[in-house]
Amino acid sequence: MDQDTQHEISRLFAVVDDFAEDMKARLSEQAIKGYRGWDDPANYRRILTMMMEHASVAAGQEVDAANLAMILWYLRKQSEL
């Protein structure tokens, strides 16, 4: 792999790491508030709707939308087991 490509990948990974830290902080805030049920497949549709609402607002909602997308990804993966 050439140096430019490696540099680009390193930059992307650094941004993902920073974003993941914000995601974790927000998930912690929500857990402290008492939010539960994220891993319950029965909540899939509700979480999907919430994600679409956060994504449509976009500005300032990126972390929440990403967390909801992560939860949907997890639920889908669990259903494939």
Residue ranges and their predicted role:
Residues 1-81:
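Flexible "arm" and connector segments at domain edges
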